């Protein structure tokens, strides 16, 4: 138990805020503020929410073992913006605090802490504008966030808080990067292994090179190239999303559907650049299959499944001849190999690596003008087309109804029938999916049909059952016009043609994924530096772990070189390149002192959040990112509790669904690599996920659509008015996400000032289910405040400040109070455990109203103390204060939470509706164990029922036990 002060510094001898109309000891905002500040100081001083670890600096100093019954609760940590919190931000934080407080009161060892995701573009942009170092701005924002969050009374272990920008934190982000860099994925073992083991296998001859070369005959540079090609982190000349307006490349997930940057709304262009990539695709199957092990919302699982996008089909090779006469194979992946005989043309992504080799020097005789893009030569047409589609996002390219493309002037050979098929490029084919090339079967794929119709290409039916003159037929049927496949159904045809392709060496069965490798570099300043240097030949070398952390240097200018947002031909120039003294170093990497250059990119903002849950378990460890014992205790699998397939992970993770295919996917990938390498015992980072809804607020626009300050709008007769500089005008109400842009932001500080933090907590939890979005209405906050005032009055005399309870045993309570008490305990316990805080509030209000009505003079201690304990997770400051006033000398933060007596949950009596010919005409109350005869007699004796019977005798009496009595006349 945590000791409490014997008298409250907040209210020991003080009264409520001065108000001539209010009783001196009424629970007001001023009194709430003093109570809340006092208890927050007490909790901090006593370390009330500090939780022990099995080992390390946070382990019990007396050697006491940690409790077996643990609970790890985590919020998605905030980005500390300059605007601070609005009332929408605390929704999830309060919900998890209620959850953690409840289970802490039941005796569980609860870890609940909050850090800050502090790297990112906003702080960098502010630094560019003001010349202030991003760290200065970020640290000031963190201080303000901690102040605002502190006012809410969140029961966090503050010793475990950190920012991703802390050098002590990002040292381990860099360390994990090195673990991934120095690993490779072994398909046979379906797991990552240390790269040293791959080298050992090549050295011993246990593994051969795929290209047939002899490992022992390779030069050191050639061996390094082979090893680098296997690493889970690698450099590649890849098509990337280049944003000149931001001066950096973006991940696919950071580009909007209309081909613009998610931040800043700048145009984004597809461009080939050499970038760091993470081989997340190696984990596609495991990332997909292990979703079944997780207690996550099904929509989030569906989003991840769709993003990973597993497809089963076949690879087929189409022979072609390059412009220089060289023989080429164009590889396609198709989920419909049964339709190969219907392939009448091919389409490559404009970025496909073979396009330039396949472009003919001139148009073949008789080329359809529709195929030429209005250009004199295929080369000119390809260049013009690439420029035209450079700023289109993948989604735009796939969803565009207008089909465009360019003929390359060359042909490939259909491997099934030997017929030549023209080769096009078109924007609806993406380089990032499959092989970046498709066989076009217009008879049975609508996009191919549309393209063929637009360009006058042949359409062949190979599956009977539809009218391909009107559109593609995608249904089942028997194969036609397909040689040896004729007469087979689709399934049999797939199997037969795949076998034939394999036998002829022109294809094989294949599984493909939509998921692409993770672009893991940004041309920014405010991010984690890479622990990588380059030698004079430009070859990358990983730094030794002893060289970590690689700290960010100060630079005179924090901005990347920004370009005209429409300049697609511009090239990245990172700000770290300006720190020449930092970039150019002399190091001994095992072969003597040599000059090297540091990598001038930084990691994406997702890096720190990909592992931060692990650091909460051991935040001060300077030797490891976390001790294995601490990770195993807080996150290890618990099959006895969660089932034999339990992957482990955080017990409850709460945050927004918008991170489904970003943070959550990246975190799962990093965690699986760490698991494979033996660094963690849990297979997944988050066992259970809950997505909280959003708090929305009314916003108001004038006749031009411009937003006006919501707090200055008044309502009259259902219409809304705003008094601006030109007088009062009518404005129009709409719902919107709370924020600065809609001028409807409301600070939690305002609500705490006007009502107190406990009122804010109760109000937000009472607004509806956690997962649902809900409208904010400041005028409704007073309802939560009045509820807390009623609870206060049950214990404290508003005139004298004295406690107004009477002692007595619980069994002496009136039966109605006793039954309602235990029903409330049972219901509230279930609600807290199920994150149904809104219904818990409703039950507490019902019980409070009952006590207020039935015990006007003084409330029995046995009735009110359980109420105070039940209220504690929701309104902890008031509950602590009332608990102290009730004579207790220990904090209730660690319980005990009341336990319902099952004997009082069984009703003595049951009310039955009585129907006459199926319509309810009366109600009777009988003993819960009443038999059929007793029920029938009671129904026939009811005055209202007798009036409807009017002397008639029922022909039949139907009794449904526990539900109703029906008299048929």
Curated annotation (Swiss-Prot):
Name of protein: Leucine--tRNA ligase
Reactions listed under catalytic activity: tRNA(Leu) + L-leucine + ATP = L-leucyl-tRNA(Leu) + AMP + diphosphate
Residues engaged in binding ATP: 740
Residue interval(s) of motif 'HIGH' region: 78-89
Gene: leuS
Keywords: Aminoacyl-tRNA synthetase, ATP-binding, Cytoplasm, Ligase, Nucleotide-binding, Protein biosynthesis
EC number: 6.1.1.4
Pfam families associated with the record: Anticodon_1 (PF08264), tRNA-synt_1_2 (PF13603), tRNA-synt_1g (PF09334)
Keyword Iron attached: no
Compartmental location: Cytoplasm
Ranges for region Disordered: 1-23
Signal peptide coordinates: none
Gene Ontology molecular-function annotations: aminoacyl-tRNA deacylase activity; ATP binding; leucine-tRNA ligase activity
């Amino acid at each position: 138990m945590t000791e409490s002060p014997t008298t409250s510094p907040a209210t020991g001898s003080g009264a409520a805020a001065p108000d001539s109309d209010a009783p001196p000891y009424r629970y007001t905002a001023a009194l709430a503020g003093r109570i809340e500040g006092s208890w927050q100081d007490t909790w901090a001083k006593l370390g009330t929410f500090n939780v022990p670890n099995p080992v390390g600096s946070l382990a019990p100093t007396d050697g006491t073992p940690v409790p077996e019954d643990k609970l790890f609760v985590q919020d998605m940590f905030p980005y500390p913006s300059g605007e601070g919190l609005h009332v929408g931000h605390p929704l999830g934080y309060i919900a998890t605090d209620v959850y953690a407080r409840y289970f802490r009161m039941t005796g569980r060892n609860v870890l609940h802490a909050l850090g800050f995701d502090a790297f990112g573009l906003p702080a960098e942009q502010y630094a560019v504008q003001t010349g202030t170092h991003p760290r200065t701005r970020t640290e000031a924002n963190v201080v303000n966030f901690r102040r605002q969050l502190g006012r809410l009374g969140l029961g966090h272990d503050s010793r475990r808080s950190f920012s991703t920008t802390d050098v002590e934190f990002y040292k381990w982000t860099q360390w994990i990067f090195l673990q991934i860099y120095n690993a490779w994925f072994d398909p046979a073992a379906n797991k990552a292994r240390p790269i040293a083991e791959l080298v050992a296998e090549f050295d011993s001859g246990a593994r051969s090179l795929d290209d047939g070369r002899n490992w022992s005959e390779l030069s050191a540079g050639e061996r390094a190239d082979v090893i680098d090609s296997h690493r889970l982190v690698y450099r590649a000349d890849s098509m990337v999303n280049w944003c000149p307006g931001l001066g950096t490349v973006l991940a696919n997930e950071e580009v909007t559907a209309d081909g613009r940057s998610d931040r800043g709304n700048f145009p984004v262009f597809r461009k080939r650049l050499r970038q760091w990539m993470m081989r997340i695709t190696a984990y596609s199957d495991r990332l997909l299959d292990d979703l079944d092990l997780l207690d996550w919302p099904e929509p989030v699982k569906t989003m991840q499944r769709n993003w990973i996008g597993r497809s089963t089909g076949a690879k087929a090779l189409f022979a072609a001849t390059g412009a220089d006469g060289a023989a080429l194979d164009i590889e396609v992946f198709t989920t419909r190999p049964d339709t190969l005989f219907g392939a009448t043309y091919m389409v490559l992504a404009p970025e496909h690596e073979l396009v330039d080799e396949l472009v003919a020097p001139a148009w073949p005789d008789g080329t359809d003008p529709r195929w030429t893009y209005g250009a004199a030569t295929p080369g000119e047409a390809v260049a013009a087309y690439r420029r035209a589609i450079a700023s289109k996002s993948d989604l735009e390219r796939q969803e565009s109804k207008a089909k465009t493309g360019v003929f390359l002037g060359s042909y490939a050979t259909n491997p099934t029938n030997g017929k030549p098929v023209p080769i096009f490029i078109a924007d609806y084919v993406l380089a990032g999916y499959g092989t970046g090339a498709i066989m076009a079967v217009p008879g049975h794929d609508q996009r191919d049909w549309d393209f063929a119709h637009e360009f006058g290409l042949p359409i062949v039916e190979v599956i009977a059952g539809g009218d391909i003159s009107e559109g593609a037929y995608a249904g089942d049927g028997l194969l036609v016009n397909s040689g040896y496949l004729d007469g087979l159904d689709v399934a049999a045809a797939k199997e037969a043609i795949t076998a034939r392709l394999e036998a002829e060496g022109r294809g094989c069965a294949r599984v493909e994924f939509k998921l692409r490798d993770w672009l893991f570099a940004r041309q920014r300043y405010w991010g984690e530096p890479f622990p990588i240097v380059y030698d004079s030949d430009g070859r990358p070398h990983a730094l030794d772990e002893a060289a970590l952390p690689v700290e960010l240097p100060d630079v005179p200018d924090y901005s990347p070189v920004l370009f005209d947002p429409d300049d697609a031909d511009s090239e990245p120039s990172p700000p770290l390149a300006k720190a020449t003294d930092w970039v150019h170093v002399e190091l001994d990497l095992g072969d003597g002192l040599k000059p090297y250059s540091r990598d001038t990119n930084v990691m994406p903002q997702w890096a720190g959040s990909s592992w931060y849950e692990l650091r909460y378990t051991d935040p001060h460890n300077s030797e490891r990112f976390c001790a294995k014992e601490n990770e195993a205790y807080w996150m290890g699998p618990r099959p006895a509790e969660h089932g034999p397939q339990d992957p482990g992970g955080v017990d409850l993770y709460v945050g927004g669904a918008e991170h489904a295919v970003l943070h959550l996917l990246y975190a799962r990938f990093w965690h699986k690599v760490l698991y494979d390498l033996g660094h963690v015992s849990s297979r997944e980072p988050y066992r259970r996920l809950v997505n909280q809804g959003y708090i929305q607020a009314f916003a108001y626009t004038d006749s031009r659509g411009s937003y006006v300050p919501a707090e200055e709008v008044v309502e009259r007769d259902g219409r809304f008015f705003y008094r601006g500089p030109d007088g009062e005008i009518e404005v129009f109400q709409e719902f919107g996400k709370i924020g600065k842009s809609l001028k409807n932001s409301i600070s939690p500080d305002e609500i705490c000032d006007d009502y107190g933090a406990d009122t804010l907590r109760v109000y937000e939890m009472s607004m509806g289910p956690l997962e649902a979005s809900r409208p904010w209405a400041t005028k409704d906050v007073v309802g939560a405040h009045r509820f807390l005032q009623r609870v206060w009055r049950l214990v404290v005399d508003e005139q004298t400040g004295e406690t107004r309870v009477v002692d007595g045993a619980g069994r002496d309570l009136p039966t109605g109070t006793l039954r309602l008490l235990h029903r409330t305990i049972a219901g509230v316990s279930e609600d807290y455990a199920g994150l149904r805080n809104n219904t818990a509030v409703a039950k507490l209000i019902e019980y409070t109203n009952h006590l207020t009505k039935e015990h006007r003079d003084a409330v029995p201690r046995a009735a009110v103390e359980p109420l105070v304990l039940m209220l504690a997770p929701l309104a902890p400051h008031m509950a602590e204060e009332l608990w102290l006033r009730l004579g207790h000398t220990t904090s209730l933060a660690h319980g005990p939470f009341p336990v319902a007596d099952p004997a009082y949950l069984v009703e003595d009596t049951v009310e039955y509706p009585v129907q006459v010919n199926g319509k309810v005409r009366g109600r009777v109350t009988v003993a819960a164990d009443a038999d059929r005869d007793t029920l029938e007699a009671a129904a026939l004796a009811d005055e209202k029922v007798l009036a409807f019977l009017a002397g008639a005798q029922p022909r039949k009496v139907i009794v449904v036990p526990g539900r109703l009595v029906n008299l048929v006349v």
